[in-house]
Amino acid sequence: MYKTFIARTKSIFLIALAVAGASIFMTNKNVTVASAESTAANPLLDKWEGPYGGIPPFDKVKVSDFKPALEEAMDQNLGEILLISANKAAPTFENTITEMERAGRTLARLRTIYGIWGGNMSSPEFQVVEREMAPKFSAMSDKITQNEALFKRIETVYNSPEKAKLTPEQQRLTWLQYTNFVRAGARLNPEQKARLSEINQELAKNFTKFSQNLLSEENDKFLVLAFEADLAGLSQSLRDSAATAATTKKVTNAVGIISNTRSSVDPFLTYSERRDLREKVWKMFVNRGDNGDAKDNNATISQILQLRAERAKLLGFKTHAHWRLENTMAKTPERTMELMEGVWTPAVARVKEEVADMQALADKEKAGITIEPWDYRFYAEKVRKARYDLDQNEVKQYLQLDKIREGMFWVAGEVFGFAFSPVSGVPVYHPDVTVYEVKDKKTGKHVGLWYFDPYARDGKRSGAWMNAYR
């Protein structure tokens, strides 16, 4: 769906968009960031070149390049970390915390592209790489957080009286590094650390399996609309979308299909007059990963819960929730539930009122039904029409994609002083993607590039999100 650029603050927005500046940083002039041979052979390890301060080489990416590039970048990162931990000089913010921030730039840049392929361009070939690399990423992370010499340096900086002389930002960064290491098991004994690493790798495998199963369910399952009568209630645009989806999936002898994604399911549940088909579509969507087949996620979920519980106990927490919330504003599961119940209780009460309105309308029409989940959107639209004379189809002409995008640009211009203009010649990872240069509206100074990828497709996970390339 839409990859919006909305951010909480201007600084976050700038981080998301900024592409200027160096891509590779070295912690020591004697460290080779990448060998000439491997860099030449694998474009994923290359520094981002070209205009706008360097741009991702999406046009050169091959799935087969990911594994060797990632493994080399991981080795580089570990080498940088070892240099920091082996430093004979007394630990300071500059030679420890700052150097840790500089370490791993090559890997971070590479994982940006890797993440884009995982969320936007997944394929069976790429998923093989994901399954192999997930536990390796976890093992590498544990090697860093379980490095005793490195943790001692961080701890020394954290407990040093000199910390008071640091800026608030530096103190915050020091606190984050120290806290993250402690939460990752830096204080455990060797036996506990070994078990923790095993748990983390198993979790990484299960998270990957869960995500891939869910994506497969969305890509492979759909409802066939075999007859013209199956389109009852759908607007022409929705009929066209269903027909296009059928063509894409090479489904013949059908007037269309409803894909197992929210962008396809929600409009069908809202407008289809075929209650029997609405039920099938609703169940298809909510039962993703819960069909007792090869893509069923129930056993995976159970394994994740067991591993999380064991990890929490190992780290000294009552439950995974206690560990997860310990460094957040809510702090505890109990406080979190209080916050949730404060919203949940009135929300449920309001939903019951809405369902009562829907049921009254259905009874008035002598529909002879009891409102079920697959009726909710359909009857919500009918109630809205009856009560307010508001038809969403009449509003749609003002909500075309181009107009929504222009509205986003206008808001960014008013709030942040940004101006957007389309650019060509910038590599993209899919033909759907369009690129815009962002400038300061007053000075004309380059701020960054914005990549817009609005459409659902096979291999792209559902939902709405934003990636920061650099």
Where are these regions (language model features)?
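Bacterial N-terminal signal peptides
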Residues: 12-24
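Bacterial N-terminal signal peptides that target proteins for export
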Residues: 2-14
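Composition- and surface-driven signal marking solvent-exposed, interaction-prone regions
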Residues: 82, 96, 198-200, 211, ...
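Short His/Asp/Glu-rich catalytic/ion-coordination signatures at enzyme active sites or charged loops
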Residues: 50-65, 114-133, 156-198, 257-299, ...
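Short, charged/polar, Gly/Pro-enriched secondary-structure boundary elements
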Residues: 9, 266, 443-447
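N-terminal helix-rich structural modules
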Residues: 37-237, 245
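Signal peptide processing junction and immediate N-terminal pro/mature segment
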Residues: 24-37
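Active-site-proximal, well-structured secondary-structure segments within enzyme catalytic domains
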Residues: 169, 173, 205, 212, ...
